[in-house]
């Protein structure tokens, strides 16, 4: 399944100066002004944060927001990469509601950010009266180290490992659980787990798959 993201407002082009403190990025606009944008990505953004990279920003609609821009896209090679990790949930929700993902079709209700497990929230919970609930965890994928191959994670993710354990617990309780990786770039046709970056996560995923 592939999706085209439509932003509510035209994006603004700039050039990356630096990304720092995980959630901040200084970007030079075409006017020459240097602004600080919100970086909605807690990962390492390996290969996507080099100074001088072309960046695309969305303007904040809330005039009271401290940071007036959000960093949405960065150019990597000949293509653009979506680095906003808050977008995949909306993309997948729209795809499910539109019947585009056969494996997740046929449920009566879709809810987002539902509490479950040990102080966690599931990205999407699908429910119907006549079938077990389905817990869907979504991960944003941006890493490409090998031509055509997207990988996850791009840094050690203890939180991701915790989520896998909680999904396994849901399966043990009789529910269905799905781990969905959304690749936010167009230059990859394959996907793999970056076991060398986080072997603990890779092992946890194997255990979760074995658990159902």
Regions picked out by a protein language model, each given a short descriptive name:
Residues 62-79:
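OB-fold/S1-family single-stranded nucleic acid-binding modules
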Residues 145-158, 165-197:
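Nucleic-acid nuclease catalytic cores
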Residues 14-16:
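Conserved hydrophobic positions within beta-strands
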Residues 76-86, 97, 102-142, 162:
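Active-site metal-binding core of divalent-cation-utilizing nuclease and nuclease-like domains
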Residues 21-27:
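Short aromatic-glycine-enriched beta-strand elements
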Residues 197-212:
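N-terminal intrinsically disordered, cationic/polar leader segments
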Residues 43-56:
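Short nucleic-acid-contacting surface segments enriched for D/E, G, S/T with interspersed K/R
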Residues 35-45:
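Short alpha-helix capping/helix-loop boundary micro-motifs
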């Amino acid at each position: 399944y592939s999706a085209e993201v439509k932003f509510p407002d035209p994006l603004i082009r700039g050039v990356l100066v630096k990304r720092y403190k995980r959630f901040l990025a200084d970007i030079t606009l075409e006017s020459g002004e240097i602004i600080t944008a919100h970086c909605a990505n807690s990962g390492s953004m390996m290969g996507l944060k080099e100074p001088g990279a072309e960046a695309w920003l969305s303007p904040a609609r809330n005039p009271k927001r401290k940071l007036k821009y959000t960093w949405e896209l960065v150019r990597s090679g000949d293509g653009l990469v979506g680095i906003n990790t808050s977008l995949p949930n909306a993309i997948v929700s729209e795809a499910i509601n539109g019947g585009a993902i056969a494996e997740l079709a046929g449920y009566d209700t879709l809810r987002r950010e539902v509490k479950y497990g040990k102080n966690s929230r599931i990205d999407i919970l699908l429910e119907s009266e006549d079938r077990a609930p389905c817990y869907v965890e979504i991960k944003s994928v941006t890493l490409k180290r090998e031509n055509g191959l997207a990988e996850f994670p791009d840094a050690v993710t203890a939180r991701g490992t915790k989520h896998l354990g909680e999904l396994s617990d849901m399966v043990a309780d009789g529910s269905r659980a799905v781990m969905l990786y959304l690749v936010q770039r167009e230059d990859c046709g394959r996907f793999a787990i970056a076991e060398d970056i986080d072997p603990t996560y890779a092992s946890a995923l194997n255990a979760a798959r074995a658990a159902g």
